Every structure is written in structure tokens, then in C-alpha cells.
Regions:
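Flexible helix-coil transition and linker loops at the boundaries of alpha-helical arrays
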Residues: 31-36, 71-81
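Residue signature of alpha-solenoid helical repeat architecture, marking inter-repeat boundaries
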Residues: 1, 37-39, 83
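TPR/TPR-like (Sel1-like) alpha-helical repeat modules
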Residues: 54-75, 93
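Terminal, low-structured helical/coil segments at or just beyond the last alpha-helical repeat
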Residues: 3, 76-100
Length: 100
């Protein structure tokens, strides 16, 4: 399977509340590293997951990767990753503002 298929599988697993399996699948997307858009989406989903579960250090690990590359991602993918970029920016700002 490629990164895009693993991403879809991970999202389905999250929807079914199969959290451990979803985390494993989304990490496979990152390890495969065959599609920058899928990797970015997987990192965003993982960052959101860890933010919601109050594991802020782990959330920062994933979201900071997007936050640091937002100009590059916007230039290369135009609006395709705008939601992921916005999510990473908002959550990073919240963690900085509230010292989470």
C-alpha cells in the first residue's frame, strides 16, 4: 500500500474508534514518506489526536513539522493542504499562548 491508502485506512480506523490501530497506520504513512501531502495530513491528524488527549509534547512534535514548513507546503500544494496548515497554526498558537 502507498501513503495515500494508509491515510484513508487510518481515518476509517479513527472513525470506528480503533485508536491504537489508527495511530499505527498513520505512523506508517509517515514512515513510508512516499507522498508529502499524505505525510502532512497524517502528521496533522496525529497532532490533533495528541492535542485532544492532552499529550502536548507529542502534539507539538507533529504540528511543528507542518508549522515550520507552511510556506513551502502552501507554495507546492496551493490550497490542497490549507486545512492542515491552518489547524497546525491554530493549535501551535494555543499551546504557546497557554503554555501547554
Amino acid at each position: 500500500m502507498n501513503g495515500e491508502l494508509y491515510l484513508k485506512k487510518g481515518m476509517l480506523q479513527l472513525n470506528k474508534k480503533l485508536y491504537d490501530e489508527a495511530l499505527e497506520t498513520l505512523n506508517k504513512v509517515i514512515k513510508l514518506d512516499d507522498d508529502l501531502a499524505s505525510v502532512t495530513s497524517a502528521k496533522c491528524i496525529l497532532g490533533e489526536y495528541y492535542f485532544i488527549h492532552q499529550n502536548y509534547e507529542k502534539a507539538k512534535e507533529f504540528l511543528l513539522w507542518i508549522y515550520d514548513r507552511q510556506d513551502e507546503l502552501e507554495e507546492e500544494f496551493d490550497d490542497l493542504l490549507s486545512q492542515e496548515i491552518d489547524t497546525a497554526s491554530v493549535l501551535m498558537d494555543m499551546m504557546e499562548r497557554y503554555k501547554l
